[in-house]
Amino acid sequence: MIGLSKPKKYTVGLANLAKFGYLTLQDQAASANVGRAGEYLALSRLSLAGYFCTLAPSQDHDGYIQTDARILTLQVKTSSKIRHWKYQFYTKHGEGRQRSDVYAFVALDLEAIFFCRGDDPIIRPTSTHLSADLFNQDTMHKVLSSFD
């Protein structure tokens, strides 16, 4: 079943709703577009900062970043707007899968990105909630230099 006859109030992440077939095709496309926009915004900021990066054709990672020391994996999580005073991101990953080296949390309405390491405790097992003030910090260089 692709869609429901009655609209439902979304109380869980869009990824979960899509997985169980509760999103219409239009909602799934909109969710995919939000995610793609976040990926391109994150990679453009990295490129402008002088890092060589590319999108990844992988289900485990969204991109790769080349630093002087090594190639890092990137996971981009995108939220289109603030909800309940926080930005909410679906951060559950599959059993046995390795987390990416770097996470980029994108707030599309602010056009701002919060970067953190994949082993940072701020990333919760299922859903990560970030306040808007975290997006005012310049975290990209700090996080990427921590791998050198």
Regions found by a protein language model. Give the residues of each.
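Mixed-charge (Asp/Glu-Lys/Arg
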Residues: 1-59, 66-148
